[in-house]
A protein has these predicted regions:
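Non-heme di-metal
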Residues: 1-145
Length: 145
């Protein structure tokens, strides 16, 4: 097992925390757009999902408690979405949630397993399955719009 301090898993947890935190804000912004377009149900969907993303971010941060007060340097890219169209925002959210499920968190889980952090691998796998649900829900609501 690799020392957690020197692991890729530590950095992946921070990437996941950053990604979930940004998703939360993007969904809060999207909820405001939906509100302006009088789409209350879509507004609620974005707010509900934003709260779930916050819960995911907390779970990832909790795994980093041993590094409290330290900085963890990561390199990653995140989407910049400045849109005023609710359908476009739903489609973008669907794509991002799908990528988290299909690629990102599966890869992070595999790395965690390879490094010997099975509990963290399970966390990534569990959250990946939730992200799949998010993607499917965003698609369903987008299709209805």
């Amino acid at each position: 097992m690799i020392n957690f301090k020197d692991s890729q898993t530590k950095e992946n947890l921070m990437r996941a925390f950053a990604g979930e935190s940004q998703a939360r804000n993007r969904y809060n912004f999207a909820a405001s757009v939906a509100k302006k377009q009088n789409l209350a149900i879509i507004q609620d969907l974005f707010n509900y999902t934003a709260n779930q993303e916050q819960a995911h971010a907390k779970q990832f941060m909790d795994k980093l408690k041993d590094f409290s007060g330290e900085e963890i340097c990561i390199s990653a890219s995140y989407p910049a979405e400045v849109e005023n169209n609710t359908l476009t925002l739903l489609r973008l959210a669907q794509e991002h949630e799908s990528a988290e499920h299909d690629e990102i968190y599966k890869s992070f889980a595999e790395t965690a397993k390879n490094e010997g952090f099975n509990d963290i691998a399970i966390l990534f796998e569990n959250i990946a399955s939730i992200e799949k649900t998010h993607s499917e829900r965003f698609k369903r609501y987008g299709d209805m719009l």
